[in-house]
Amino acid sequence: CMALSFGACQDIVTYNDNYDDEMASSGAPVIDAVYDSKDRDKLLPITDGNLEQMIVLDGSNLSRVRKVMFNDVELPVGEVYATASSAYLPIPRQIPLEVNNKLYYETELGSTTYDFTVSVPLVQVDGLYNEFALPGTSVQLKGKYFDLYGFGGANSTSTVKMNGVELEVDSISDKYMSV
C-alpha cells in the first residue's frame, strides 16, 4: 500500500522597514559643502582644491550624475561615485582654458553650480640629469607638471630654448622632460 501526501506553503515575506538605498533623488541637485576625502568626519569644508585631489560633495539629490565640470574641464562620469546625499570624485588633472572658479554638477533632474577654485600648479624645474652632456646628446629636465603645459608632440604649444635655439622634446612625463 502506498500513501502520498503533498503540502505547500507560501513563505514569501516582504520587508521594507523604510529601507533607503541612498540612490533616489527627488529634484535638482543641491551642494551644501565640499570636503577633502581624507576628512572622513566632514569637519572642515573647503572652497578650493588641487588637481587630482579626491573630494566629497555633501548635499541632496546628487545621484544619477550626467555631467561634472571644474571650470571648463569635464570629468568622466565613470570617475564619480554618487548617492543622493554625497558624491566622491577627483579633480581632473588638466589645466582649464577658461577659469570661472565654478563646479558644475548635473543629474537627470537638473543642475547646479558651486563656487570652487582649482589651484593650477606652475611648471617646476628641480634640476638636470646628465648635466655634463656632450653637444647633440639628450638631457633630462627633472621637475613636475611638464605634461600639463603642452611641451613636445605634434600639438605642442610650449617650447624649450637654450641660447635662443629651440630644442626638440624627445619624451615627456609629469616628472621629467628629455630634450
Please place each PLM-identified region on the residue numbering.
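Beta-strand/beta-sandwich contexts
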Residues: 10-63, 109-155
